[in-house]
Amino acid sequence: MRPVRRSAAVLFAVLGCASGRQRPPPAEPVDLAGAARSALQHAWSGYRRYAWGHDELRSLSKAPRDWYAEPLLITPVDALDTLILMGLHAEAEEARAHIVQNLSFDRDIEVKNFEIVIRVLGGLLSAYQLTGDPRLLALAEDLGRRLLPVFDSPTGMPYVNVNLRTGKTSGARSNPAEIGTLLLEFGTLAKLTGNDVYQAKAKNALTQLFSRRSPIGLVGEEIDVETGAWTSRQSHIGGGIDSYYEYLLKCWLLFGDEDCRGMWSSSIEAVNRYVADPTPSGLWYGAVDMDTGRRTGTEFGALEAFFPAVLVLAGDLDRARQLEESSFKMWTAAWAAADVFDYAAMRPTHPRWPLRPEIIESAWYLQTATHEPRWTAMGRRFMGDIEACCRTDAGYTVLDDVTSGKQGDLMPSYFLAETLKYLWLLGTPGALDLRTIVFNTEAHPLRRTW
């Protein structure tokens, strides 16, 4: 069986994916790494042709999209380490040159701290470690300095937004993910620059959040960073909370931080006790009240599918396997992993899939830990579906509806940073050693050199 070619992908997209469940399974590439590398070349070529100098590509309109009034080159920064790892040297050098010559953070724009940290700060730090280019570290340090005012709240937990030029902050209503998903990046910046304030501020934010957990050990999904009061007391592992748990564990793995290890151990015990939901259809993680553990929802989705990866890192392979199998049932119930999937009814309730990486990420971690062929086979299925349903003339695009195959009009930067990277890694066993690197939540590998 040969890798899906462009003509086949277009045929599936028109005649198959759009017709929903009647579509036969797509052609799956034998050479998964080669298919992922070719997909990255196609995606980069489309961005280069239609959105150069901008943040992202509208891949149906063949037009650029910027996040703010002025672009921050989010796709080139997010994609650079993927280009390097896949050996696309000309494209990587093109991206690096464009970044160091054109990226400036001296801009009068208000940005979302969390997204800029995981994508841009994380991307710059990873690319610096891979290339040794001091200009990338200088950009990272300039960005980190401009983001520091977010921590100037009464609690030390960060505001949501900050103006890169003035330092003015806004957005007191935040969530555990946006508060607790900063320490890998700010900690690495501190280690590489010798300025400990970055790590201290981010760790204080994390510990302040942890200290506000409920008596049964859970956090809610929204908190006021000025008062420290929870404004939503629903608990789960999905969007708004997800990477908080990820970073509790990974900050111990990257920095050897015993405080983080203790916070992780306490938290995962509570999550597995209250949030996990063993059902006849498999193991899932739903939603509960943070104070009582009472079940409030049976919704799982594409973002929650990151959790098997974290369980692998924690050594809980049995639970990781079970949850990844459940995630795969969610994928095959339609033609990708819906943003929201009701596992009690086994159907999508919010059927969008914006090219997310999490289910693929978890398959790679399981493959790395177990060497079982099951996970690589999953990767081939994921790659085949992406080619069939999401490929366009200009790159790849999100699915607005996984049940019908209706396409949207955006190629998010994380598709290049994460989704294609994890597909390539699934097809390239041993390419990265998890004993020496830790991925941030945007799949930027950070190497412990201290």
Tell me what each language-model feature is.
Residues A8-G16:
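Bacterial N-terminal signal peptides
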Residues M1, G16-A18:
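Coiled-coil-like amphipathic alpha-helices with heptad-repeat character
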